[in-house]
């Protein structure tokens, strides 16, 4: 699946130019694939200025969460960052997670999360781990 993403990103970046920010950032994640290393190096060399700016927007969301998570919310990067940052902002959700709820779900099993989410047990909530699930499901 990663290889297919790399192929599509290569075609898109070469076809439409380097102003496709989302595709460039996806190419970064495919950097682990040996097939895509040459293409990513080419992207670095050709558009290092705009790509750094777009990168920082994505990585700052993750790193800001990790800095806040150093206060005891270290398990939050397990969850999908795209849901927590886009829907709730990077500063709001992590203080709402209690250390008990996260340590329960991460250390015991995933079934613990489903049990505490009674009443909110839809597949979307289980995937997103939204703050509202923990706020109202735990208390």
Curated annotation (Swiss-Prot):
Residues 13-41, 49-98 have a biased composition (Low complexity). Residues 1-12 have a biased composition (Polar residues). Residues 1-98 are annotated as: Disordered. This is Intrinsically disordered protein, expressed in pharynx 15. It comes from Caenorhabditis elegans. The lineage of its organism: Eukaryota, Metazoa, Ecdysozoa, Nematoda, Chromadorea.
